[in-house]
Curated annotation (Swiss-Prot):
The Asp-Asp-Xaa-Xaa-Asp/Glu (DDXXD/E) motif is important for the catalytic activity, presumably through binding to Mg(2+). This is Ent-beyerene synthase KSL4, chloroplastic. It comes from Ricinus communis (Castor bean). Diterpene cyclase involved in the biosynthesis of labdane-related diterpenoids (LRDs) natural products. Catalyzes the cyclization of ent-CDP into ent-beyerene as a major and ent-kaurene and ent-atiserene as minor products. A motif (DDXXD motif) lies at residues 525-529. The keyword Hydrolase does not apply. It catalyses: ent-copalyl diphosphate = ent-beyerene + diphosphate; ent-copalyl diphosphate = ent-atiserene + diphosphate; ent-copalyl diphosphate = ent-kaur-16-ene + diphosphate. Pfam families: Terpene_synth, Terpene_synth_C. GO terms for biological process: gibberellin biosynthetic process. One of its GO terms (cellular component) is chloroplast. GO terms for molecular function: ent-kaurene synthase activity; magnesium ion binding; terpene synthase activity.
Length: 774
């Protein structure tokens, strides 16, 4: 990862790669205090606080970087500090134990304290001030120098190069460090080995330029100077360059920091883009971004402008670039993935063991919307392999990040949003600290407050969801659907499938529709497959076609009567609700959706009866409809927001449905091929094998099915994120994408929908088990 990431980083024990991880588990009450959202806080008050966080994010002061800035002499004399206010800040901000740095008291951040303290001591010694402070600082270093060789300590980036070099600087200044000579020699040797290991990585060496002293080729270092005059947006690296070269652009950069921050500087600047992206990402993961949707859009508008202008802050940082790409693309911004080609190989990253960067790149790589985005395919391949290796080898010590990586790898293209929100809330470390060359944290992003609010928000919604599920279970019994012994009983899975993503209170009717129609399509499908005679199937279709005149027809069996009454009562009820939303009667539309579905199911029943084997194209043309997403999605959409006749009859609307349905049909076929073949049912996998007369194996057929799924998923996502020329409302398009992610979840390795026990823990987590925070 480059600057701006929220990871903790350290030099690996092999001295070849910089590894990313996030610090968690701050042990002291001072750091771990929970913030409660007052019960009296209105939604407006809560929203106001979140808006404030989005408007501007501050970063903690860096004693380490401030010390390097304080060491810069005036350009016309080496006897005066160029930034005397920074020197004054150092003199006023020593901790009681003699150290400098964030007062975290974290037992694994002693190397960070050593580095910051020695840098501050050097600044004081250079200008011959604060002798008492120097002595206290040296006492701290001498008492804690053991941590410098402790591999269990979290190491700031470049510590093994910079810290021993600062010891040499101190000796040259006449400091009496009183350190064990053997230990110092060991550190110097390690520095040499580390430096040699990075000789073919000039950017890595340039980033820790302050630790290379006379060994450094400063002209080579300055090749990495950015347009704002900095080296890697790092005040310490830039200060070191200014000390040696008196570069005008370096001076302008540091002078701008002095004007903006006054006495002390952060460890990275600028950082605004990444910080605001991080807060938006956190709001989405906590499930509370809808409270500030307009502010979120304004922030993303700003970031999109920066993207279009080629911002170095975005494009030179893989974590920032990948996150910006993901959030912008999924929120409908027309941006190219070309920028990510800079990271399509692991070796192109500055820090090649940065887990957070790898994870962000992995997530971004799954957002392919056209065939020529080959860079995304390459990124997906190498990041997935790398993350799997790190996970298997136990190389991700942060448990929260480890869980996130494990989930991401296990659920590509799949999602149950509400369960992920709950996991994120339960594992969220609101007090996380990040580490570049020194530790830092966002100082005005009250993440404890966000955590407490999301906790309250989740449990409030969950109570509402439990009531809805109770109503649905009564509905099943009301129509006698539980008496259909041949049918799968799926009300919990059906409700879970939509509640996991469409959870807001204003979508209650849409959720009810989704769940009811999921149950109805399931029992009807089972009736057509296993229980109903051809006479009964035709009877049911005729009843639906006649609708209000059904009493003149009669029922061929009790099962037909139960099914029709459930359909008739439920569709009429949903049509009445849809009338309120649409301002017009759409009952005929809802009935026609069911008739179209039943006729495709009938065709498959006729194929089975007559032992006809259709071609692949004919099978898919019929099968995407018989997969039965029509009543589930299309009727629910009528209950979400007004949809004009132009929208529901448009080619765009139709294609969204087709792509989602084909994805579902083929995902189901891929995991049920053996079972359905044994049952004598048609399947896209078995059709290929049979149609080729054995020339195609089952595995090859599954690979072809996977290729088709990928193509339709890519096209579906393109349509979902596209805004130009689109007439389908964004929330409606998102529901098709939600269905795709749910289908990938249900059919990852087996038919999870037909095996509700596989989803039992997730169902309970979302509907029955409230979040309990310590």
């Amino acid at each position: 990862m480059l600057l701006g990431s929220t990871n903790t980083l350290r030099i690996s024990s092999h001295g070849k790669e910089w590894e990313g991880k996030t610090l968690t588990g701050m042990p002291l009450g001072k750091v771990n205090q929970r913030v409660k959202v007052p019960a009296s806080d209105s939604e407006g008050a809560i929203t106001s606080k979140i808006k404030e966080m989005l408007s501007k994010v501050g970063l903690s002061v860096s004693s380490y970087d401030t010390a390097w800035v304080a060491m810069v002499p005036t350009l016309d004399s080496s006897k005066q500090p160029l930034f005397p206010k920074s020197l004054n800040w150092i003199m006023e901000n020593q901790q009681s134990d003699g150290s400098w740095g964030l007062d975290l008291q974290h037992p694994l951040l002693i190397k960070d304290s050593l580095s910051s303290t020695l840098a501050c001591v050097l600044a004081l010694q250079k200008w011959n001030v604060g002798q008492q402070l120097i002595h206290k600082g040296l006492d701290f270093i001498q008492s804690n120098i053991w941590a410098a060789k402790d591999e269990h300590q979290h190491s700031p980036i470049g510590f093994d190069i910079i810290f021993p070099s600062m010891i040499e600087y101190g000796r040259d200044m006449g400091l009496n460090l009183s350190l064990n000579q053997s230990l110092v020699e060991t550190m110097l040797l390690k520095r040499e080995l580390e430096t040699k290991s990075l000789k073919d990585k000039p950017s890595n060496l340039a980033y820790v330029a302050e630790g290379l002293n006379r060994l450094n080729d400063w002209k080579e270092v300055m090749k990495f100077q950015r347009s704002n005059g900095s080296l890697f947006n790092s005040p310490s690296s830039t200060a070191a360059a200014l000390i040696h070269l008196h570069d005008g652009k370096c001076f302008e950069y540091l002078n701008s920091l002095a004007k903006q921050f006054g006495n002390a500087v952060p460890t990275i600047y600028p950082f605004d883009i990444y910080a605001r992206l991080s807060i938006i990402d956190t709001l989405e993961k906590l499930g509370i971004d809808s409270y500030v949707s307009e502010d979120k859009e304004r922030v993303l508008d700003d970031i999109c402008r920066c993207w279009m202008q080629g911002s170095e802050e975005i494009f030179l940082d893989p974590t920032c670039c990948a996150m910006a790409f993901r959030l912008l693309r999924m929120n409908g911004y027309a941006i190219s993935s070309d920028a990510l080609a800079n990271f399509d190989e692991k070796e192109k990253l500055l820090h090649t063991k940065d887990i957070k960067a790898m994870l962000e790149l992995f997530k971004a790589s799954q957002l392919e919307i056209c065939e020529d985005e080959s860079a995304l395919c390459r990124i997906y391949a190498w990041t997935s392999n790398y993350l799997k290796e790190e996970l298997v080898n136990g190389e991700i010590p942060d448990k929260s990040l480890q869980a996130e990586v494990d989930h991401a790898l296990g659920h590509p293209h799949a999602s149950m949003e509400r369960k992920e929100i709950k996991n994120f809330i339960e594992n969220y470390n609101a007090d996380k600290v990040s580490l570049l060359k020194t530790s830092y944290r966002f100082c005005n992003a009250n993440e404890n407050y966000l955590l407490a609010f999301s906790f309250r928000d989740f449990n409030m919604y969950q109570s509402m969801h439990r009531e809805e599920l109770d109503d649905l279970e009564r509905w099943v019994k009301q129509y006698g659907l539980d008496k259909l012994k041949y049918a799968r009983q799926t009300i919990r899975s059906a409700y879970f499938s939509i509640t996991s993503s469409l959870f807001q209170p204003n979508h209650s009717d849409a959720r009810i529709s989704w769940a009811q129609n999921t149950v109805l399509t399931t029992v009807v499908d089972d009736f057509f497959d296993f229980s109903g005679s051809m006479e009964e199937l035709l009877n049911l279709i005729e009843l639906i076609e006649r609708w209000d005149e059904h009493t003149t027809i009669g029922f061929k069996s009790k099962e037909v009567e139960i099914l029709f009454n459930a359909l008739y009562g439920s569709v009429n009820d949903l049509a009445d609700k849809a009338y309120i939303v649409q301002g017009r009667c759409v009952k005929r539309d809802l009935i026609d959706i069911w008739i179209i579905l039943l006729k495709t199911m009938l065709k498959e029943a006729e194929w089975a009866r007559d032992k006809n084997v259709p071609g692949m194209d004919e099978y898919i043309e019929n099968g995407y409809i018989s997969f039965a997403l029509g009543p589930v999605i299309l009727i629910s959409l009528y209950l979400m927001e007004p949809l004009s006749e132009e929208v529901v009859t448009s080619k765009e609307y139709d294609n969204l449905f087709i792509h989602a349905s084909i994805i579902g049909r083929l995902l189901n076929d891929r995991v049920t091929a053996k079972r359905e073949f044994a049952q004598g049912k048609l399947n896209s996998v078995s059709l290929q094998v049979v149609g080729s007369n054995g020339a195609i194996t089952e595995e090859e057929a599954k690979e072809e099915v996977t290729r088709i799924i990928t193509s339709h998923r890519r096209e579906l996502l393109r349509m979902v994120v596209q805004t130009e020329g689109s007439i389908v409302p964004k929330s409606c398009k998102n529901l098709f994408w939600t269905m795709s992610k749910l289908l990938h979840l249900f059919y990852m390795s087996e038919d999870g929908y037909s095996s509700p026990t596989k989803m039992l823990s997730a169902i309970n987590a979302i509907v029955n088990e409230p979040i309990v925070l310590p």
